[in-house]
């Protein structure tokens, strides 16, 4: 008999509860620090992860819950500028599309949030390396805690 996907996911969440609880606390502290210091939340991802990054950025800027009246929080998703992405990729390759945008947009008050299901995407890893080298806070949201992006 095939197991219910909800039950499977619930088991995974329960097995990782302590790890997730601590991770959520750390991420919350980082976001609070960035917001208090007038920094930006900068999101990136590829494919479905790009969609997640764009959605999260929209939530911070626009508060998509109409009952929630608050000021917008500076946020951007690096996957939205198709003119830059296609031009840079055509001339220089896809591996540095996010790193290049971080060079132009990010500073030490900001946080770079990288979404990657595999955690092995070169453009994500290169952006994390750049952010770390410049003292920009980084958060990696991946499908594997053993991935290259998670180790950074």
What are these regions (language model features)?
Residues 19-37:
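A short, well-structured juxtamembrane/interface segment
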Residues 49-54, 120-127:
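Short glycine/serine/threonine-rich phosphate/pyrophosphate-binding segments
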Residues 79, 116, 142:
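Short beta-strand/turn micro-motifs composed of small residues
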Residues 33-105:
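Glycine-rich, small/polar surface segments that engage phosphate groups of diverse ligands
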Residues 128-134:
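Surface-exposed amphipathic alpha-helices with a cationic face
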Residues 1-19:
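Generic N-terminal amphipathic, Lys/Arg-enriched alpha-helix
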């Amino acid at each position: 008999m095939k197991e219910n996907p909800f039950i499977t996911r619930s088991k995974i969440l329960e097995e990782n509860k302590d790890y997730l609880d601590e991770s959520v606390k750390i991420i919350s502290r980082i976001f609070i620090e960035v917001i208090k210091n007038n920094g930006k939340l900068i999101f990136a991802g590829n494919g479905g992860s790009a969609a997640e990054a764009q959605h999260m950025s929209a939530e911070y800027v626009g508060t998509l819950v109409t009952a929630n009246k608050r000021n917008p929080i500076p946020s951007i998703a690096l996957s939205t500028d198709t003119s830059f992405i296609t031009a840079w990729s055509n001339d220089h390759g896809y591996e540095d599309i996010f790193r290049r945008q971080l060079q132009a947009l990010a500073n030490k008050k900001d946080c770079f949030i990288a979404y990657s299901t595999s955690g092995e995407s070169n453009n994500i890893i290169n952006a994390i390396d750049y952010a770390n080298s410049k003292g920009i806070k980084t958060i990696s949201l991946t499908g594997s805690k053993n991935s290259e992006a998670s180790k950074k």
